[in-house]
UniProtKB/Swiss-Prot annotation:
This is Galactose/lactose metabolism regulatory protein GAL80. Keywords: Acetylation, Carbohydrate metabolism, DNA-binding, Galactose metabolism, Repressor, Transcription, Transcription regulation. It comes from Saccharomyces cerevisiae (strain ATCC 204508 / S288c) (Baker's yeast). The gene is GAL80. The modification N-acetylmethionine is found at residue 1. One of its GO terms (biological process) is positive regulation of transcription from RNA polymerase II promoter by galactose.
Length: 435
């Protein structure tokens, strides 16, 4: 069996579900209720929510009642939550600015819970590389399997592109261009938009979030980290005008300290491939171009990924492929789909891959949870499956870990350093992490 192929649909395990404790699940608002909760709801045989923690216990109680979480308990303190033996996996779905102050004591308190096996943290891991390294060390010392929410790796479009590249359908990669729109960081700001995403240092900005997710996806698709990078980061829009829900200007301007434009270029370690990337803030538009375009040019063919938003990890993309071979999706039984009788192996063809009704916001997180389930229950019957692994790297199987997050944090740190120094940096050792 080839474990580097894309996963087939997993079977439902005949075992007790993974018991999940949430920090940040709120039925009234937030990222967790929009993504994590519906994903778990679709995998109710594999996961069960058993614990909630919020600084205000009333929020957790209200969430349990509203979502009818009959097996869940609301905990009054972080210590009592982390110590509970009813939790197998803790999910951190709060603002990045609070990750360090919550996760560090949580890992210490969790030593009283012998059943804790998994720690799942939303990207970014922390507000800085130093904080991220500290969280990684604490999690490693605690001995839990870690997961980071770089869910773009689970997008069906990214996995298909990765297959086409890894199986040689486009030959050797010659060059890559990326252009994206970061949306929030233009001249206008919705009045109800949270203030923290416009303030530098909170771990949510054009470089860390928009670029970070996209460049992780690119490295994953191409199975290569960068060797050299050069970057320019701009904040040319230091103030934004507030607008209401209908787009009407409110006559009030507010400060913005996060970047609104990024120019990035570099070369991949594998093949010395040049990569150019531009991300801008501003009102997304469908009038002239897509808000995300990734062009990958090879010696035998080309790939193009397009999306209506500059956030590849939560967008329903379209994948275009032009080359000499395609249309060989693996079937569930491991066999190849039959080619069209009129198919000419030497003739250039084009493939358009798009799932019309795919909800990428929930779907990619759902696939991430499915991968955790596959690992926990070994639903693919992989012989000698390890009880833990340090990083996913570029493997098809598994899920991204805090080590994968550290490597990405180091690249982002290098982006800001390159901008500050005005020079090209050697980042070839970025994945050789010794702590």
């Amino acid at each position: 069996m080839d474990y580097n192929k894309r996963s087939s649909v997993s079977t439902v395990p005949n075992a007790a579900p993974i018991r999940v404790g949430f920090v940040g699940l709120n039925a009234a608002k937030g990222w967790a209720i929009k993504t994590h909760y519906p994903a778990i709801l679709q995998l109710s045989s594999q996961f069960q929510i058993t614990a909630l923690y919020s600084p205000k216990i009333e929020t957790s109680i209200a969430t349990i009642q509203r979502l009818k979480l009959s097996n869940a308990t609301a905990f009054p303190t972080l210590e009592s939550f982390a110590s509970s033996s009813t939790i197998d996996m803790i999910v951190i779905a709060i603002q990045v600015a609070s990750h360090y102050e919550v996760v560090m004591p949580l890992l210490e308190f969790s030593k009283n819970n012998p059943n804790l096996k998994y720690l799942f943290v939303e990207w970014a891991l922390a507000c800085s590389l130093d904080q991220a390294e500290s969280i990684y060390k604490a999690a490693a010392e605690r001995g839990v399997q870690t997961i980071i929410s770089l869910q773009g790796r689970k997008s069906p479009y990214i996995l298909r592109a990765k297959e086409l590249i890894s199986q040689g359908y486009i030959g050797d990669i010659n060059s890559i261009e990326i252009a994206g729109n970061g949306g929030w960081y233009g001249y206008e700001r919705p009045v109800k938009s949270p203030k923290y995403i416009y303030e530098i240092g909170n771990g949510v900005d054009l470089v860390t979030t928009t670029f970070g997710h996209t460049i992780d996806i690119l490295q994953y698709m191409t199975s290569s980290y960068f060797s050299r990078i050069n970057a320019m980061v701009f904040n040319n829009i230091p103030e934004q005008e507030l607008i209401d829900e209908r787009g009407n200007r409110l006559g009030q301007r507010v400060p913005k300290t996060v970047p609104d434009h990024l120019l990035f270029q570099g070369t991949l370690l594998n093949g010395n491939v040049p990569v150019s990337c531009s991300f801008k803030g501003g009102k997304p538009t469908k009038k002239f171009t897509k808000n995300l375009v990734i062009d990958i040019h090879g010696t035998k063919g080309d790939l193009k990924l397009e999306g209506d938003a500059g956030f590849a990890e939560i967008s329903n993309l379209v994948l275009y492929y032009s080359g000499t071979r395609a249309n060989d999706f693996p079937l569930a039984n491991g066999q190849q789909a039959p080619l069209d009788p009129g198919y000419d192996a030497g003739k250039e063809i084009m493939e358009v891959y798009h799932l019309r009704n795919y909800n990428a916001i929930v779907g990619n997180i759902h696939r991430l949870y499915q991968s955790i389930s596959d690992f926990h229950f070994n639903t693919k019957k992989i012989p000698e499956l390890p009880s833990q692994f340090v990083m996913q790297g570029f493997d098809f199987e598994g899920f991204p870990t805090l080590m994968d997050a550290l490597i990405l944090h180091r690249l982002i740190e290098s982006v800001y350093k390159s901008n500050m120094m005005g020079s090209t940096l050697n980042v070839s050792n970025i994945s050789h992490y010794s702590l």
